[in-house]
Every structure is written in structure tokens, then in C-alpha cells.
């Protein structure tokens, strides 16, 4: 935030911001450079799904932020909120938890893994979850995201974290991207369906 407005970044799928010395050589896919007195901040995005924009009003009033759901690791994402948010949603539960208007940050990988751990089929209508399933899914999403953060995120192709290093959460993935492989719990072959245009891996026995 600046006195005259806010510079907003969306990192997309592969974007990253890093602080570096002003004389440091530019890296491939460095697109934006913010120069300060003793350092600079560079925005790097190999896949170019992210963006940067300038907004002169209160950033919380911007249309891109105003409609967002709560951050998953805050107290705002709780049982009461989650139950109410899905109560009238008959869409597949995976689509609902990936909807940023419901909760932000639960992308395809983390939604897939959370549903597997909770033994919930990704296509199950959201409003058919019982209270125990809602509570377990809520807690699992939080745990999965915390674990991913401690491991630096998930690097599948070109993702790097703020330190310029790849993440290691992919080494612990249970079902995401495992189509055709045996389930690590019951050995049944992992299957995949498409929901809202995204591949959704699941175990037909466990879920």
C-alpha cells in the first residue's frame, strides 16, 4: 500500500515475488521490477496467468477482493460459516471448496487431497454433507494448507516459492495426479473425472 493507492498482484499458478539487490541480473520471466532505495522487488511468472494492477481506492473495496470468501487459515473460516456457505449448494463439493467466493486458496491439488483424506467423493453434492463431514473437511483443508506451506508449496512444473526454491509438498501427494496408480490406502486403482474443467483424482473404494 502507498499513500496514493495500492499495487495489487495476483500470482496466478506460477508467479512469484522476490526481494533482491538492484544490480542482480534479471532472470528469465522477470516481468515487473519495483525499485526501492536499497533493494528491488521483482515479479516473475513463467506461465503468465498472474497480473499486476494499480488501484487508487481502498483495496478491500476492489471488485476482485470484495467478493472473496475468507482466508482458510483464519478464524473466519469456521464450522458455522462453512455449513452456511454450502447449505444451499447442490454443486459437487470439490467445485464449491475451489470457489474463491466460498474460501480462497483451496486450489485443485489441496481440494483433491483434502477430500481423499475425508473419504468424500469429489462429485458429492455439497449440501448433502453431514455435520461431521463438514467439520472434518474444514479441519483437513486447514491442515493440508499448513503442511504445504511448511514444505514450500507444490512444484509440479515451474512453481517456485518466495525464496526462489521449488516446493516439496508434491512428494506427499496421495491422489492428485495419481490416476491409474494403486491407492496408498486400499490398493484400488485411482480414477479421475472432470469437474468444472479440472481433473479430479479419487479412490472409488475409499471415497
Write out the residue ranges for each language-model feature.
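Extreme N-terminus of proteins, especially the signal/transit-peptide cleavage junction
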Residues: 1-2, 139
